[in-house]
Amino acid sequence: MWYNERMKYPKIDLKTVRLQARQFQAENPRLFLVYLLPSMLVILSGFLNPLERINESVLEQPFLSVFGHVFQAYLFPLLVSFIGTVLLTSSVYATLTLMKDSKTEPSVKNSLALFDEERFSQTFLTLLLKRFYLFLWSIPNLLGIYLLFYSSFLAKKFVTLHPEFPNLDLSSVETERFLMVFGLYFLASLILIIVGNILYIPQYYAYSQVEFLLCYSLDLGQASPRRILKTSRSFMKGYKFQHFVLDLQLLPWYFLNWITFGIASFLLLPYIQCTKISFYRAVLRAALSKKYQLNYPW
C-alpha cells in the first residue's frame, strides 16, 4: 500500500524523525565507534566490482553457464554484503540499547553484541530469510537486466561484424533480422525491469523493519524469523510511501557517501541509521496505539 490513509495510519512527521536522529547523535559524539566496523565494510565494498570479472563472451553460452559465471563473480561481494548487514544490525542493536540506557558507553565491542552464541543463530537465520524473500521478488528485475546486457552484447557483435555501420542497407534480410531480435530482447528487458521494480520496491519497504524488530525480539527471547518478517509487513502497511519519502530526503547523504568512496560513512552511517530507528519507533508507537484502540492483544 503506497498511500497513507489518515484514519487508519496516522502520518509520521519525518522532520521530527530526522531532528530526533540529529539530537541523539549530538548527545553521543562517540556513536561513530559503534558503526566503525560496518563503515569499514562499506569502504571495502566500494572497491568490489563483480562486473569487471564477467567477460561479455560469456553471454554466448547457455543460460545456466551464464548464471554460473555471474554467481562466481558475485559470490564474494554478496558474502561481504551479508556480513555487513549482520554487523550493521548488531550496531543497530547497540544503538537501541544506548537509547534505553544512556549510561551505556558506545564502543566497537558493543557493535558485536549479536555475535554471541545465543543471538547469532537467530540473527543469521532472520537476515538470510529476508535476503531470500527479496531475492525471489527481484527475479523479474534480474532477468530484465540479463536481457538488457544480452541485447547490448548482440548490438556490439553486430557492429563488429559490420564495420560500415551505421551506413547499412536496412532492407537486407540480415539487418531486418538483427533489428527484430534486438528490438524484442531490448523491449522484453525494459518490460521486465519496470515490472520487476514495481514488484520489488514495495516488498523492500515491507521488510524494511526486520532488523529493528529482530533487535526488539532478541531482548524478549522471541526471535522467530518468519514471525519477524510477517510483523514487518504488518507494521509497514500504510507507511511504505513515507519510508520511501524518507529515503529520498536522505538521498544527498547517500550521494555524499558515494562520491567519497564510503569514507564519509564513518559520520553518515550513524545518522542514517538513527533516522531509520526513529522512524521505526514512530511506526511502533502508531502500531501499538492502533492495537490498543481496537482492543487487540499485542
Mark where each language-model region is.
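Hydrophobic alpha-helical membrane segments
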Residues: 2-298
